[in-house]
Curated annotation (Swiss-Prot):
Protein's gene: rpmI
Keyword match Ribonucleoprotein: yes
Alphabetical list of Gene3D superfamilies matching this protein: 4.10.410.60
Source species of the chain: Leuconostoc citreum (strain KM20)
Amino acid composition bias (Basic residues), ranges on this chain: 1-16, 31-45
Claim: ATP-binding is one of the keywords in the record: no
Protein name: Large ribosomal subunit protein bL35
Entry's Gene Ontology BP terms: translation
Family (UniProt): Belongs to the bacterial ribosomal protein bL35 family.
Lineage top rank: taxon: Bacteria
Keywords: Ribonucleoprotein, Ribosomal protein
Amino acid sequence: MPKMKTHRASAKRFKKTANGGLKSASAYTSHRFHGKTKKQRRQLRGTRMMDSTTVKTYAKMLSNI
């Protein structure tokens, strides 16, 4: 049986945490900030944790990380 391959596009965007969760950067942060409030821009900084239902789907793609 062939080896499982890691989905490289996903591997560049997500990091696995020690407890098996996945974190990623926030979306909507590359441009068009003039339409966002200060609060929205502040809350978009940093990383986000993926919810548990989505983690199950992505865990298969990121099995070797």
